[in-house]
Regions:
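Short, basic amphipathic alpha-helical segments that act as recognition/interaction helices
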Residues: 28-48, 61-64
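Short Lys/Arg-rich basic patches
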Residues: 1-7, 20, 62-69, 74-75
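Non-DNA-binding regulatory cores of transcription-related proteins
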Residues: 77-79
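Surface-exposed, Lys/Arg-rich phosphate-binding patches that contact polyanionic backbones
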Residues: 10-27, 45, 53
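Generic leucine side-chain signal with a strong bias for well-ordered alpha-helical environments
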Residues: 6-8, 16-19, 31, 36
Length: 79
């Protein structure tokens, strides 16, 4: 097992804590695991040539996620 430690600004820690409250996540480890799961899914989708977006079903609109790390993803699925 590897221990990972992060130094974050106070404001970012407040944002993380608010996300945890909103989603009923109890530990920062669980928050990290959820974030990692979502990121892995996004990378796999980008490798498959898909667009990552949020869809507003009521207004029939969508908004593409723009994230520099995902712009670097190309090629076949390997996850």
């Amino acid at each position: 097992m590897v221990r990972i430690q992060l130094d974050l600004p106070d404001e970012q820690v407040k944002e993380l804590d608010e996300l945890m409250r909103e989603t009923n996540i109890v530990t920062r480890k669980d928050l990290f695991n959820n974030a990692l799961t979502l990121f892995q899914w996004a990378v796999k989708a980008k490798r498959a040539g898909r667009i990552i977006a949020s869809i507003d079903e009521q207004n029939k609109t969508s908004k593409e996620l723009v994230m520099p790390a995902l712009e670097n993803v190309h090629g076949p699925v390997s996850i």
